[in-house]
Each structure stands twice: as structure tokens, then as C-alpha cells.
Amino acid sequence: MRFAVVTFPGSNGDHDALMAIRLGLGHAAELVWYTETDLSRFDCIIIPGGFSYGDYLRAGALARFAPVMSAVAREAEAGKPILGICNGFQILTEARLLPGALLRNASLEFVCDWVWVRVEQTRTPWTSQLAPGTLLRLPIAHGEGRYYVEAEELVALETNGQVVFRYVDADGLPTADANPNGSVANIAGVCNERGNVVGLMPHPERAYDRFVGGDDGLRILASVLSVGLEVAHSPR
């Protein structure tokens, strides 16, 4: 499979994602500059973390207007697997490819730590090889990671099975103490209605090697392989 890792001015997680795909999965990955307008040659797309455009206005607000995002939207419509990590998640919500918004952390502080997340849905390409309730230990590093939707939309997300990851403690319980940023309902990641576009605040690409902290993130990245190949070879 061939992965695109989209790079914006200010991205800093692009090389992490590149190495996770190349070294962790053993698949081809290419850095794609924000001016690119055609992503059809790729099987999967990753929008990495960082501070695109310096987070001016708010995180992801300017990146949504980059030329590459029109291409991302086309591939999302075609059903291609797309993963937004941290700032990539923020960009996808700003582009309305994912529901909700990412606000300042409840603490008003930048949070850098390791957290537990629980897999809530396995209908997405990025969780297809995981069992519901699987616990993953992943790193976080963000200042605007508090996921928010109105109460009515939260009910819809839960009903539609769009909550993909939830912050929990080591026992798998979604407690207040396990919530690092004040996200509504301890939500760490969501998907679109179709399930092919996923965004999460934790960094799976920084957890692909057990010798440098853990390899739970590799389980997310590896899940896309079988589903991604099916999409790549389906009629467009």
C-alpha cells in the first residue's frame, strides 16, 4: 500500500508518521506538500500533527483552505481511508469532514503525557482489526484537544457509532481523572458517518516501537492494511 502524509507549513508530526509507516508497517509512504491537488495515486491519507500555519486564528482554521484539502475531500467522498492525528484531527473538523470541534484544554495548559484509550467502534478501516473494548496506551501532546459537540449531536454520534476512541483509566473506565483535556464524554476520536475518515488527538505514530515507549499505535495503523487494499482496488 502507498500512504500519503500531508505536510503543511508548521507540521511537526509528518516525519513521525512517515517513519511509522515505513519502519513499523514496512509500506511505502510519501510526504505530500500542502499545494498538492491530486491524491488519487495513494491508497491511504494521513494528516499528521503539528501547528499548521502556527495555529493562527485557531488550530486547523487556515489549513482547511490549503489546496490539498480539496483533494482530501474528494478522496474522502470516494471512501478512501483517511486519518487525522492531533492537528490533523483539528483540520478535519475545520474542513467539516468530521463532526465537532477541538477547543482549548479545560486546564488551559499544554498537556504532554501518555493516556489510555478504549476502542469503541471497529467499523472503521483504522480499527477493523481491533476488538471492541481494546485498551491502547498512546502519547498525547496538545493545547487544543478538548473535543466538543452540542448535546443533541453527541446523542447522534453515540447512536450512529461515530465515537471511535474514548479516554479511560487503566481498568478501561471513562473517569474524569482519565480525561486529559475535558473532552465531552471522554471522547478521544471520532469518525464520519461512513466510517472511512477518522480523527483522534492521541498519537499512534509515536507508539510504533516497544523500545521507545510502546507499540500500541501500530495496531491502529496496521488495521487499515486489509481494508485499504479493498478500497484501492474497487471501482471509483
Curated annotation (Swiss-Prot):
Name recorded for this polypeptide: Phosphoribosylformylglycinamidine synthase subunit PurQ
GO function terms (MF aspect): ATP binding; glutaminase activity; phosphoribosylformylglycinamidine synthase activity
Glutamine amidotransferase type-1 domain ranges (all copies): 2-234
Chief location category: cytoplasm
Source species: Thermomicrobium roseum (strain ATCC 27502 / DSM 5159 / P-2)
Underlying gene: purQ
Cross-referenced HAMAP family: PurQ
Disulfide bond sites: none
Catalytic center residues: C86 (nucleophile), H203, E205
PROSITE patterns registered for this protein in UniProt: GATASE_TYPE_1
